[in-house]
A protein has these predicted regions:
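Terminal, low-structured helical/coil segments at or just beyond the last alpha-helical repeat
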Residues: 3, 183-216
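Short coil/turn linker motifs that delimit alpha-helical repeat modules in TPR/alpha-solenoid proteins
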Residues: 45, 82-86, 120-122, 158-161, ...
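"A position-specific structural signal for the A-helix of alpha-solenoid helical repeats
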Residues: 55, 86, 92-93, 124-134, ...
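Amphipathic alpha-helical segments of tetratricopeptide repeats
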Residues: 74-78, 112-118, 150-156, 189-193
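Transmembrane alpha-helices and immediately adjacent membrane-cytoplasm interface residues
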Residues: 36-63
């Protein structure tokens, strides 16, 4: 994995080196002896612009190194050249970084751009819509938040932690609408999923105190 990450990190540089060697061999011995070098150079350079360093960005984000992730994403000079599914992931990652920096307007714009391009997997679409729902809640737009979160659940979410977060947000929205029976039903779904993420688990504890005093 580390070797693959190194290849991805230095893919453009390696492509340029192979291209230079290819030109030298071509001048010294002709085209066919240099063909393999040209081919490797083409694969590396084209791969850099079509697929980008998404694997590196995700690695940094999983480690919590947002600064490292930002540096890598800023190194993508021509995002328009990325193939469509990769470009969608690119805008999702930009949205995640903007959210981490509390720049919610920019995050929303990037997430919507990602959705408009089409997500490579249904679970990714669900996670994207869940984040848009949470952004709408940040702005106090409960109707839009509910709409996005319901769409996220229908599309499918990558794991039980995301599912629990979605149902917890719906529970909060129902409380805000004073639909207490629906709120309790969504809270039961959250409890059934048994989330372990500290932030979600803490929210569940806080919500449980409120739910126990709720009518309906």
């Amino acid at each position: 994995m580390k070797f693959l990450n190194l290849i991805i990190k230095y893919r453009l540089l390696l492509g340029a080196i192979f291209l230079v060697f290819g030109i030298i061999v071509n001048l010294e011995a002709g085209f066919w002896p240099s063909f393999v070098l040209y081919l490797i150079a083409a694969i590396l350079i084209i791969g850099h612009f079509l697929f980008g360093p998404m694997r590196l960005i995700q690695g940094y984000m999983e480690e919590g190194d947002m600064e490292g992730a930002q540096k890598v994403i800023d190194s993508i000079w021509f995002p328009g050249l990325l193939i469509k599914p990769v470009r969608s992931v690119y805008f999702t990652l930009k949205g995640n970084l903007a959210m981490a920096n509390q720049d919610f307007e920019t995050a929303e714009a990037h997430m919507k751009k990602s959705l408009s391009l089409g997500m490579p997997m249904k679970e990714a679409e669900g996670a994207n819509k869940l984040q848009l729902g949470m952004l709408a809640m940040q702005k106090g737009n409960m109707r839009e938040a509910e709409n996005y979160i319901r769409q996220a659940i229908r599309a499918g979410l990558p794991d039980k932690e995301n599912e629990a977060a979605a149902y917890l947000q719906l529970c909060s929205i129902m409380i805000n609408k004073r639909e207490f029976r629906a709120a309790k039903e969504y809270f039961r779904k959250v409890k059934k999923l048994k989330p372990t993420t500290p932030q979600i688990a803490d929210q569940v504890k806080q919500m449980e105190k409120y739910i126990s005093r709720m009518p309906g």
